[in-house]
Design a protein with these regions (language model features):
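Mature, function-bearing regions of proteins
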Residues: 1-130
């Protein structure tokens, strides 16, 4: 199986000096997902669920509004709505996934690439962290 999607291990770190000194750091997995591979990932990757519960889960309804359609379809509608019509073939999503149904995902990045693998659009979907 030759997948383009990847998992990266890293850390979330935060430090504040005022009004009260406070800091923390904890491990996190960041997923770079080729949206065309979602069904294959769901079928072949242990502990990954697409639109169903698992250890790591991705739901279409969590992204780009709760409307109908896949994430890729909703992104295409959003780009067209704002007048962006340049063609792209691949969408890579950089995100953290739900872990045991819980989510901490303040920002999701979408990279839309053309057939030459050049970035045509870079979209950030920002969620409130509170």
């Amino acid at each position: 199986m030759n997948l383009k999607s990847r998992i990266y291990e890293g850390a979330i770190t935060h430090a504040r000096t005022k009004p009260v000194k406070h800091n923390f750091s904890f491990p996190i997995y960041t997923f770079v997902i080729d949206l065309d591979e979602l069904d294959l990932l769901d079928k072949e990757v242990r502990f990954f669920g697409y639109n169903r519960g698992s250890v790591f889960t991705l739901y279409d309804s969590d992204h780009l509004g709760s409307g109908d359609g896949s994430i890729k379809q909703k992104l295409k509608k959003w780009l067209i709505k704002f007048g962006h019509k340049e063609k792209y073939s691949t969408v890579k999503m950089i995100t953290t996934l739900r872990v045991f149904k819980h989510t901490f995902n303040p920002v999701i990045f979408y990279y839309c690439l053309n057939s030459e693998n050049n970035i045509v659009y870079h979209v950030a979907e920002v969620h409130n962290t509170f």
